[in-house]
Curated annotation (Swiss-Prot):
InterPro entries: Alpha/beta_knot_MTases (IPR029028), RlmH-like (IPR003742), tRNA_m1G_MTases_N (IPR029026). It is an enzyme of class 2 (transferase). SUPFAM superfamilies: alpha/beta knot (SSF75217). This is Ribosomal RNA large subunit methyltransferase H. S-adenosyl-L-methionine binds at L76, G108, F127, S128, K129, M130, T131, L132. Belongs to the RNA methyltransferase RlmH family. GO terms for cellular component: cytoplasm. Specifically methylates the pseudouridine at position 1915 (m3Psi1915) in 23S rRNA.
């Protein structure tokens, strides 16, 4: 399975970079995983609704440009479906079973994802009803993907 994590914004925090590097290393035994970091759109602090839409649309174009037609796209969004770790593992296993060898997880910028990205997505996933920093989501997502592979192989890790 080829997994892409497409994310808006540059990761700055050293501790997050270290955690992400660790999970990428662990995941290399199970799948080819790449993190694609795309620049966020520079915008002033107080945006109108119209300006917010423009920012999301510009970021959305960058995201969609990185997704091929044969990729199964999972948008990370607060309004997405929440799953347990076991349910998430089953979902990933089903994708592999049904021949979906390319999977892209999409993490938007601080304003979220554009409507075009949401339309392109095959499903939407939420890790919590809480708002979480999009940079932290990369680490949380990688840990859950790793956990899913361990669950699916019956390997110790998940409790």
């Amino acid at each position: 399975m080829n997994i892409s994590i497409i994310s808006i914004g540059k990761l700055k925090e050293k501790y997050l970079k270290q955690g992400i590097a660790e999970y990428l290393k662990r995941l290399s035994a199970y799948a080819k995983v790449e993190v694609i970091e795309l620049p966020d759109e520079k915008a002033p602090e107080n945006l109108s609704e119209a300006e917010m839409l423009i920012v999301k649309e510009k970021e959305g174009i960058r995201i969609l440009d990185k997704i091929s037609d044969d990729t199964h796209v999972i948008a990370l969004a607060i309004e997405g479906k929440q799953k347990s770790s076991e349910e998430f593992a089953i979902s990933l296993d089903r994708l592999a079973t049904y021949g979906k060898s390319k999977v892209a997880f999409v993490i938007g910028g601080s304003l979220g994802l554009s409507s075009e990205v949401m339309k392109r997505s095959n499903e939407s996933l939420s890790f919590s009803k809480m708002t979480l920093p999009h940079q932290l989501m990369r680490l949380v997502l990688l840990e859950q993907v790793y956990r899913a592979f361990r669950i699916n192989r019956g390997e110790p890790y998940h409790k």
